[in-house]
Amino acid sequence: IAGGGADILIEWMPAALASREKGLNLVNIAQPFKRSGMMLTCRKDSGISSPADFPNKTLGVWFYGNEYPFLSWMSKLVIATDGSDGGVTVLKQGFNVDPILQKQADCVSTMTYNEYWKVIDGGLSASELSVFSYEDQGVSTLEDGLYVLEENLSDPAFVDKAARFLRASMKGWEWAANN
């Protein structure tokens, strides 16, 4: 979007705010999802049944803007993220669940609609997992918002095109939900 290759960007709000702070004037023009689907999924056999069990564990975390809710959560719990004694070791997780399946991490980042089910498909049962929703922990953020460059909003033709795109997109989502 910064280079002009796109008019509208899909982004998580923390990443968009970080980009805005660095000078990329993004504006959220639509927020289709009201709740976060982000979770931290942990192996019970690693001794984790509550967030109080996180210290001295390895937690897989997505970056590229997805780390902000995690860091907020650890700050709220007063748990260091530098691998020090009493803190957690942060494993920069790819967008897969291999670290929990291969026991490289005690917990991994998952989404309710995707990676959690990859953990299940990978051979772990729900009864073998402790799952912590970012919503339930009070540290969720808005995901998958639609953003534009602020300066484009002064162009009536752009605003019209974006409005038509949003109406069509929401109509498509409504159709998908109903069918």
Predicted stretch roles:
Residues 14, 95-179:
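Pocket-lining segment of extracytoplasmic ligand-binding domains
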Residues 1-102, 106-113, 132-134, 140:
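Short, glycine-/small- and polar/acidic-enriched structural segments
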